[in-house]
Amino acid sequence: MKLKLKLPNPGLDERIPSHAELEKLELEEAGERPQWDNKAQYMLTCVGFCVGLGNVWRFPYLCQSHGGGAFMIPFLILLVLEGIPLLHLEFAIGQRLRKGSVGVWRSINPYLVGVGIASMLVSFMVGMYYNTIIAWVLWYFFNSFQDPLPWSQCPVNENRTGFVSECEDSSPVDYFWYRKTLNTTPVIEDSGGLQWWIVLCLFCAWTLLWVCCLRGIETTGKAVYVTSTLPYLVLTIFLIRGLTLKGSVSGIKFLFTPDLDELLNPSTWLDAGAQVFYSFSLAFGGLISFSSYNSVHNNCEQDAVIISIINGLTSIYAAIVIYSIIGFRATERFDDCLNGNILTLMNTFDLPEGNITESNYDGFLQHLNSTVPAVFQDLQLKTCDMQTFLSQGVEGTGLAFIVFTEAITKMPISPLWSVLFFIMLFCLGLSTMFGSVEGVVVPLQDLNILPKRWPKEVYTGLVCLVSFGLAIIFAQGSGEYWLALFDGFAGSIPLLIIAFCEMMAVAYIYGIDRFNDDIKFMIGHKPNFFWQATWRLVSPLIVLLIFLFYFVTTVSKELTYIAWDPQSENFPTLETKSYPDWIYAIIFILSGVPALVIPAVALYKLIRNRYFFAPSDSRFSNSCISDKYCPPNKPYINGEMIYYLFSFNFL
């Protein structure tokens, strides 16, 4: 009986007639590059890289602040028109050329090497501060093995006559975060010195990351079985627990109650586009590297669609979980506010217990206001409004380390829920860092600026060590301000520019027809009209619009940061402060340098090839990738120093 040949994708049967031919092609295409043990490892790694902390603490906030369920409409539309096409493009070029971000763009055109270097620089800078967040998570995780939790109550003062005033004026969760964890300074200019506990946690975070990335995909491929799946288990546990808590349904209803007027607000669409872009971890180079370890005939188109769907659904699922807990927190705050007012009324008017209840509270207030208005005004009762408590949504570190930790303190067996929550955040952050490290190590190897004989363990260790040394800046008292600066500028404008260059390079420099042929070679059929339209026009246009809007709004407004200042008049409200003038130089390094690397490298290669290229010199024999891109013969300018300067072949 003749066995039917099972091919990786339909449509390859005309080119691959037998099992022997298939095995031969796979071996030839694989070369010496490592490969994934199985498809599950690759998919879990990509999901772990794409699904990160932003899905948990930024997407729910955007939903709540942009019309609830109405925000889903632009989010899903832009996910299809922007996220999936660019994800497919990065998967395809990495898989076809089997190289990292630098090697891929060098192969497409030597003048595009700067795109890969820019991706590497952004991955390096983002990884530095992202792993600091993991260090904070570890600090909270270590402190979760206490009952009661250390952020559940204020500490007593030195005289033991009362509580610490800074904590009394704010809240236990605020005090533990800003004072006990960060020891925050009131201004960014005041470093506040190193906080040794954060330095230790930072060292643990980078050491754990190095161990997991020790041998590239050989080790990360094993780790993702835990880091990419455990967050879903913990989210499900929190959802089940959240739905049993009082007020959880109110939070979910508040999240998804649509305000269709928000669809007419341009910022809603631009925030949705930015969230899609960043939640896919596009333009970092990590996805290109991961896909390069695939078989050339892997169905990258199908992978892009599946991972995009998982990413989008995870964002929605996480929002439901988060707002079920926020609904519980808002209900607890509402009840505390109401009970406090009732107690004040009972003491003022000497009323018996149970005389005022939640059901007759509003009527009783109206009665007092009409009968004894002067006394009523002097009471200064708090405003207890459920919608106000629900709308006090925050994003980022505020959601994780303040809002959620406060909600956890109100749960029974709070240490258990705290441990689970920070394990989930740790896994989300760590799996994302796998891609960031890959986005630095692989291009570093492709650039050949370090000895080739060094094993990958040394490359990874060197990247982690240098990153740890530079990330010490985030362990200062002003560390949170520096982290916010890096987050706002290192991972914004440069990524948009890189993504735009990627799409334009593939569509108009490499050529969309050649790219279509490559995809047909890999998966057996050419991309359909949807992919053609998005790659050629729609996706680049969306990215360009997001970039222009972001650039214009950033340039036109004064740059400020939010500071914790116990001496301010409005404390505990966070104070908005202006950056010092010298900070603009830092912003240029974070945003400008990675973006300018792209034209700078192209200009360097143009000058070198046109004026300093010696075709007969053996040291330049490998300076171009193919005959098509080799420059014409130009006069060679002698001079030992100039010759040495332009003879490097790492670009």
Question: Which sequence ranges carry the predicted segments?
Answer:
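Transmembrane helix-loop boundary segments of multi-pass membrane transporters
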Residues: 60-78, 109-110, 218-227, 270, ...
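Extracellular/lumenal N-termini and interhelical loops of multi-pass eukaryotic membrane proteins
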Residues: 131-190, 248-262, 329-405, 499, ...
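Membrane-interface "cap" regions at the ends of multi-pass membrane proteins
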Residues: 2-57, 86-91, 101, 114, ...
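Hydrophobic, membrane-embedded alpha-helices of multi-pass small-molecule transporters
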Residues: 44-54, 126, 131, 168, ...
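Juxtamembrane transmembrane-helix boundary signature
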Residues: 39, 44-45, 51, 73-109, ...
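Transmembrane helix-boundary motif of multi-pass solute transporters/channels
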Residues: 41-77, 88, 213-219, 286-294, ...
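Membrane-embedded translocation segments of transport machinery
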Residues: 2, 6-36, 217, 221-437, ...
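A generic transmembrane alpha-helix motif of multi-pass inner-membrane proteins
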Residues: 130, 472-474, 484-507, 527-627, ...
